[in-house]
Curated annotation (Swiss-Prot):
GO cellular component assignments: cytosol
Record organism: Ectopseudomonas mendocina (strain ymp)
Highest taxon of the lineage: Bacteria
Entry note: cofactor: Binds 1 zinc ion per subunit.
Protein name: Adenine deaminase
Positions annotated to bind Zn(2+): 14, 16, 194, 275
Amino acid sequence: MYDWLNALPKAELHLHLEGSLEPELLFALAERNKIELPWADVETLRAAYAFNNLQEFLDLYYQGANVLRSEQDFYDLTWAYLQRCKAQNVVHVEPFFDPQTHTDRGIPFEVVLRGIRQALLDGEKQLGISHGLILSFLRHLPEEEAFKTLEQAMPFRDAFIGVGLDSSEKGFPPRLFERVFAKARSEGLHAVAHAGEEGPPEYIWEALDLLKVERIDHGVRAIEDERLMQRIIDEQIPLTVCPLSNIKLCVFEHMGQHNILDMLERGVKVTVNSDDPAYFGGYVGENFAALHEHLGMSEEQARRLAQNSLDARLA
């Protein structure tokens, strides 16, 4: 990574902890937990990281998450991510975790949360990286399941700062989760949601008006709706954009088509994030580098993007 990019203090606001599970750690955890994997070795697994759409990725993502069983596993996953953050001068993180991915496999909620939380606290003490954890609901599951997850989480209310919405976007509009988001907000939690990645601009409107989110995760399709763009600019609603993810999942055919810098120059508060870096070929630093190499991002633009990420923090 370029030294001048590395030198910029940055926050990461769109990162799924389960998506930072590198193949090497995945194999190590499988061995620790005596789980047989369908891949012969790390190279075979990496070769499987070729996706035509979001769903193909998610199928592999959930299969990979199956190796996470104990508090120590979740600690190791989170700690490995934080070490990469330290190396790239990421000074604040607001990662997502997907409790339902694990509780549906019989892993107790508190096992997941304790491992992640301890690593985040150690990251603050030992690495100087501050944090705010976000509990994310899976949108392909019914809202009643999200309510159950929120209920399970409330005894640990001080461990996380907000709720999010992720997983398969097409066919699962934000309006399906209006009640559970209202409940979460009534408990004093922040709200964010994935919208406008594969889904249409209407999903962004719903996230803003029905879920009353403070940030939009992805949001790149907002550019298709001029009225929506104007609102996002006027209200300075942050978009947590994930360039390498967008290419890997065919949201854009290649980086040269990406609209993040167009949005930046129009006054949108866009930020650079890695989404699921183990699967998409890079962490925050690699995403910044890709914008420089393929879109000609200037040092001044990089500074604005980095500052946007710090300004858009919820914690």
